């Protein structure tokens, strides 16, 4: 299939460019194979039950994610033509976006078909890390992210390397407590990178947004490292209560206050310069609907996604304005954490937690 895509690429690029694409994509697909093959014995729910008969549709979708990431990664071999051959960027963005969608549904399909497995869980984590290694580098070449976002690309590998070093030095490695937030933050990184690869979104906005997506994930890795190294014990009653209090304060105080602040910021921005001067009517309606959704807590995450799309597509507020920063980073916080208490309808929160929490 990669060879077929290479031939397809020759319709838009010279053959001497499609050949390097094929080489890098093939090497990445080989890596996908090498990551998968030694883990086939994990194609079961746990060690006490027999292996499943075949991979199943969910694992096939996960492997397809690896293939799509490889196809996207091939563009790293042809950076010189990315600005001139826009169709190549569109294809790469589409490939990674489909991979991100598969990441959202493969676990759901595994549960619906009764084929959840250790193999699927491991490959899911490995391909998340691979995708967040490949796609951000491509986004950096396109000028869509700041170089510091590459810390997200290496964070997982540094974390795993740190654990192996502790094990090699006979130091204890403590277990992590289950966390829905950990998986949610990682999943939204894929979504962020998938969006910024698309050409229409403004680089000035996507670079800033990267800070809002990056810092919570890196903070999570730091906390997790403190846990596995024994500096924090989330199972100890006092420290467990501290984490619960932080979560409670976030849900009951911080996020509701953020929604009020966002609504006020949009109202102030509107009074200073009505959005109709810079946006067409459908875009203005999207802004108003998205802000109302977040203010009322009605599918607030979906509202945050809508507002972020508008800000990145054609922002009605100058990027240099403090109000823009408020709108951008509060929307990202709501997308990652939800609207919190005093929300009218939080089905999107339940969907995110159900999908990411398994």
Language-model region placement:
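Core segments of transmembrane alpha-helices
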Residues: 2-4, 64-73, 125-136, 160, ...
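Cytoplasmic-side transmembrane-helix entry/capping segments in multi-pass membrane proteins
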Residues: 52-66, 176-183, 303-310
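Acidic (Asp/Glu-rich) catalytic motifs at the cytosolic membrane interface
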Residues: 95-137, 218-229, 293-295
């Amino acid at each position: 299939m990669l060879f077929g895509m290479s031939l397809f690429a020759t319709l838009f690029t010279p053959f001497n460019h499609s050949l390097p694409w094929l080489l890098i994509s093939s090497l990445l697909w080989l890596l996908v194979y090498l990551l998968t093959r030694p883990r086939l014995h994990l194609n079961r729910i746990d060690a006490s039950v027999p292996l499943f008969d075949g991979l199943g549709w969910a694992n096939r979708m996960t492997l397809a994610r690896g293939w799509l990431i490889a196809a996207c990664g091939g563009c790293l071999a042809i950076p010189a033509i990315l600005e001139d051959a826009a169709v190549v960027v569109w294809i790469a963005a589409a490939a990674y976006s489909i991979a991100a969608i598969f990441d959202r549904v493969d676990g759901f399909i595994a549960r619906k078909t009764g084929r959840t497995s250790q193999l699927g869980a491991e490959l899911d984590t490995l391909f998340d890390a691979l995708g967040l290694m490949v796609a951000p580098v491509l986004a950096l070449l396109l000028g869509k992210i700041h170089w510091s976002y590459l810390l997200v690309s290496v964070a997982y590998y540094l974390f795993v390397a740190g654990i192996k070093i502790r094990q090699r030095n006979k130091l204890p490695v403590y277990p992590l407590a289950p966390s829905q937030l950990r998986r949610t933050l990682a999943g939204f990184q894929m979504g962020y990178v998938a969006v910024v690869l698309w050409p229409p979104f403004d680089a000035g906005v996507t670079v800033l947004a990267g800070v809002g997506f990056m810092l919570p994930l890196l903070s999570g890795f730091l906390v997790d490292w403190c846990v596995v190294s024994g500096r924090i014990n989330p199972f100890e009653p006092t420290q467990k209560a501290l984490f619960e209090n932080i979560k409670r304060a976030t849900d009951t105080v911080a996020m509701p206050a953020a929604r009020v602040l966002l609504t006020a910021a949009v109202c102030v921005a509107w009074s200073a310069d009505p959005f109709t001067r810079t946006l067409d009517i459908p875009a203005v309606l999207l802004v108003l609907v998205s802000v109302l959704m977040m203010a009322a807590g009605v599918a607030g995450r979906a509202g945050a996604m809508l507002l972020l799309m508008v800000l990145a597509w054609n922002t009605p507020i100058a990027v240099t304005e403090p109000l823009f920063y408020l709108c951008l980073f509060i929307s990202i916080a709501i997308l990652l954490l939800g609207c919190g208490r005093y929300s009218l309808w939080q089905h999107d929160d339940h969907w995110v937690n159900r999908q990411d929490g398994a």
